[in-house]
Amino acid sequence: MDSKNQTAAMGILLTISAAHFLNDLLQSVIPASLPVLKEANALTFAEVGLITLTVQITSSLLQPFVGAVSDRHPMPAALPCGMLLSGLGLILLAHATTLPAILISVALIGCGSAVFHPESSRTAQDVSGGRRGFAQAVFQVGGMPAPRWDRSRRRLS
């Protein structure tokens, strides 16, 4: 890969890494908001557990299926679509006042994450220029600080 292509590839990798940070930051809002949601909506611990289960099922268990489809039919539009789904879920969560509305909101956040991760990882591999380990590492670094940043920010509040 020539210098110009390497620069472009690094730009794409850094953009995907930054998007990974934002995606994981959006998802880390859910556990941080559980105490507020519980109190504001008089939820039981079982209902809070259902919120957590919903986001885990949609974000984690859906990912392999999205990845399998992405392998056969690359979907570059999945990156912004995943971010939009997560963003929409977060906006809806901010206005949700019933358990079903909360569950739909967190399911959208989880689905957005499930759509974003496989395609963004595939894109990182595609622009790696044969440096797959490096490309994957740059992509992973973006997602690593989001939950930790959110936890440290909450401690300071």
Regions found by a protein language model. Give the residues of each.
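Pair of pore-lining "gating" transmembrane helices in MFS-fold secondary transporters
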Residues: A8-A32
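Short hydrophobic/alpha-helical segments at membrane-entry points of transmembrane helices
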Residues: I16, T98-V106
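Residue-level signature of mid-helix packing/kink "hotspots" within the transmembrane helices
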Residues: S28, Q56-P64, P147-R148
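Extracellular/periplasmic helix-loop-helix junction of adjacent transmembrane segments
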Residues: S33-S60
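Small-residue (Gly/Pro/Ala) motifs that create kinks and tight helix-helix packing interfaces
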Residues: L34, A146-R155
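Conserved MFS/SLC helix-loop-helix module at the cytosolic interface between two early adjacent transmembrane helices
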Residues: L61-P100
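Cytoplasmic helix-loop-helix junction between adjacent transmembrane helices
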Residues: S105-G143
